[in-house]
Amino acid sequence: MLTLSFSTIPELARLLSLLGNEQRLAILRSIAIDEKYAREIAEELGISRPLAAIYLRQLEKAGLAEGTGRTSDEPPYLRRYYRAVPFEVVVDLNVILSLERSEDETG
């Protein structure tokens, strides 16, 4: 299981912002149950395919999702299937106290 870590307040804020979006959480839940590609997720959640693709890329960049390209007999012939990466986030007062205030702070 991936334990997400952060060393600055801005890093933690970005992660919490990413996870604080209901649609991204719904996508994570969906791809934790079964691998899917952007169009399937968009139809399931009632959002646009471009928005689903943006959210999937954000989740993948954060390490919370993995995408794998596969070919299909039907259009689109090349699809990128996503699955959730098991992860945990631990945030408590001690963690917050240990964080640097900014990414430029040296101590």
Indicate residue ranges for each PLM-predicted region:
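Long, low-complexity, charged/polar intrinsically disordered regions in eukaryotic proteins
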Residues: 1-9
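Conserved segment of winged-helix/HTH DNA-binding domains
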Residues: 73-107
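Beta-hairpin "wing" of winged helix-turn-helix
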Residues: 62-76
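Short, conserved clusters of charged catalytic residues that mark active-site
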Residues: 10-11, 66
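Alpha-helical residues within the helix-turn-helix
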Residues: 43, 60-61
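N-terminal helix-turn-helix DNA-binding core of bacterial DNA-binding proteins
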Residues: 11-51, 73-82, 87
